[in-house]
C-alpha cells in the first residue's frame, strides 16, 4: 500500500493530522508497503465455506481456487496470506483482506468498521468504489440472534455460547447449515435463511 494510503487509513482510525506519521498503527503491526485488502472476482460455483477471517490462504492458493483481480487478471503469485470476505453474501462484493486489515480491527473489532475504513482510504487515494453495491442486511436484534444461535446449536451446527452477537462463529454455523440444506453457504442471513432458522 502506498505511504499516503497507509497514512490515510491510519489517520481515519487514529484521527491523526495529515502531516503526522502513522506511528500508532505501525505500533499495532501495520506493514508498510502492504495494502489492507482489495476487491476480487470469484468464479461461478465458488465454495463460500472458504470465506471468513478464520480461513487464510496465500495468494497462490486463492488463485488456484479461481479467485482473480477485478479485471480478471491473475493474482500475484506470492505467499502473502489473505482471508476472503463476502460481508453481504454471495450477491455482494468480495474482498481479499491482508494482515493490515487486522490492524484496523485492533481499533474496532467490527468487520464492517475495518472494511469501511479501508474502502474510504482507497477512495481518498483515487481508487474506485466497489463494483457491486452491498446487499441490504436484515436488522437482527439480540433476542433474534440468540434464537438463531440456540436453533443452530440444537441442530448440530455449533454457534458457540448464545450471546446475541452475530459474529464470525454464528456466521460460520449458518454457512454449515446452508451447505447441509443445499443452499449457497455464504453465511449471510437472507430472509429465506432466517425463515428456515425460525427467526423471521
Language model: regions and residue ranges:
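Extracytoplasmic and endomembrane cell-envelope/extracellular-matrix remodeling and assembly machinery
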Residues: 2-3, 7-150, 154-157
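Short acidic, glycine/serine/threonine-rich helix-capping segments at coil-helix boundaries
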Residues: 138-145, 153-197
